[in-house]
Amino acid sequence: MFVDKVKVYAKGGDGGNGMVAYRREKYVPDGGPAGGDGGRGASVILEVDEGLRTLMDFRYNKHFKGKRGEHGMSKNMHGKKAEDLVVKVPPGTMVTDEETGALLADLTTHGQRAVVAKGGRGGRGNVRFVTPANPAPDHAENGEPGEERNLLLELKVLADVGLVGFPSVGKSTLLSIVSAAKPKIAEYHFTTITPNLGVVDTQDGRSFVMADLPGLIEGAHEGVGLGHQFLRHIERTRVIVHIVDMSAMEGRDPVEDYHKINEELSQYNYRLTERPQLVVANKMDMPEANENLKRFKEALGEETKIFPVSAITKDGVRELMLAIADELEHAPEFPLHDSEEQVEGRVLYKHELPIEPFTITRGDDGVFELSGAELERAFKMTDFAREESVRRFARRMRKMGVDEALRKRGAKDGDLVRIMKFEFEFVE
């Protein structure tokens, strides 16, 4: 098992702007307000798809932005809500906010969903601001900005495919040429003492996880060599790729090797024999390989399909990877037996962005700088092209206590105050 990690950016769509509009009707002031609300922006949602096994797709697409809601229209017509952006992830994906380190979601079951970036609500049209004192308001809200955050997706990956065979038959070499894994390769036995895993991406767009497992020897089911450690890992795979050395340079007979390995698998756990097994005749670039392959085929019979390859020259490797991907499409899942690998009662954590109180700082140029989630949200939703909207924003700041706080910090009439990239004069 290894942990696959990828960083992605998600932003919910902004809400549509509310509209300032009036209907043309006799005896109604200014025709009466008739501006509709904007539509809600699209949220970015992660959804579990049990057909996915890796985070490979996120290597090429790391930015996810929801669409904006439609703007409000005249005649009290509201803008259309944007359709949520649903992003598929494999089971077992954990989602963390990169900035805060907070766990946002732990996605485990097919169809489970988590909203990771909410779409902004639509701005209200001028019909929403009617009062007895102001029956025809010339004010509407801009749409609320959608949430945005950088996320860390983590997936604990179990191998789909296990490479088995005696030591030094070429398992590590094969894994190194079909994936980005860098296993230790040397001309002595048991170079691999822990599983190496790599993600294989086939030419037709399919992907799977392959494990180069420690070499198996006789007596492994009784714990000889790395037996128990090896067999615990092979128990988790869905397809077994049995690699046999056709060169016979180690002094072993390919036919005997094949039967000995299968005997160890059957002795350890009868369920290992239920897994689909692809037989690979490796080291076909060596002098004696063709003669040994002929004898090997005769011993196994026509019903056993054998894939001749050379991990060194890469001959036959592409066809082998496609055959493995085909086999995986029909191979069933096998449950894990180790309690340490099972996670019970996983919880979907709902993350709510806390409302920050505003803060006041002084910039290097001496300008008072205002920041804070609630204040910046109100600022972004204000249409500063309309005088009534500007006055409303000023009243809201006073209600929040911003004016009083600026005075306590020494602000005087005419001093500059900056919100985001915009500057205003402080007026007593």
UniProtKB/Swiss-Prot annotation:
GTP binds at residues 165-172, 190-194, 212-215, 282-285, 310-312. Residues 350-428 form the OCT domain. Its cofactor is Mg(2+). Residues 159-329 form the OBG-type G domain. InterPro entries: G_OBG, GTP-bd, GTP-bd_Obg/CgtA, GTP-bd_prot_GTP1/OBG_C_sf, GTP1-OBG_CS, GTP1_OBG_dom, GTP1_OBG_dom_sf, OBG_GTPase. Its EC number is 3.6.5.-. Residues 1-158 form the Obg domain. Gene3D superfamilies: GTP-binding protein OBG, C-terminal domain (3.30.300.350), GTP1/OBG domain (2.70.210.12), P-loop containing nucleotide triphosphate hydrolases (3.40.50.300). CDD domains: Obg. Its main location: cytoplasm. The keyword Flavoprotein does not apply. PROSITE patterns: G_OBG, GTP1_OBG, OBG, OCT. One of its GO terms (cellular component) is cytoplasm. Keywords: Cytoplasm, GTP-binding, Hydrolase, Magnesium, Metal-binding, Nucleotide-binding. The keyword rRNA-binding does not apply. SUPFAM superfamilies: Obg GTP-binding protein C-terminal domain, Obg GTP-binding protein N-terminal domain, P-loop containing nucleoside triphosphate hydrolases. Mg(2+) binds at S172, T192. GO terms for molecular function: GTP binding; GTPase activity; magnesium ion binding. Monomer. HAMAP family: GTPase_Obg (MF_01454). Belongs to the TRAFAC class OBG-HflX-like GTPase superfamily. OBG GTPase family. PANTHER family: DEVELOPMENTALLY REGULATED GTP-BINDING PROTEIN-RELATED, MITOCHONDRIAL RIBOSOME-ASSOCIATED GTPASE 2. An essential GTPase which binds GTP, GDP and possibly (p)ppGpp with moderate affinity, with high nucleotide exchange rates and a fairly low GTP hydrolysis rate. Plays a role in control of the cell cycle, stress response, ribosome biogenesis and in those bacteria that undergo differentiation, in morphogenesis control. This is GTPase Obg. It comes from Shouchella clausii (strain KSM-K16).
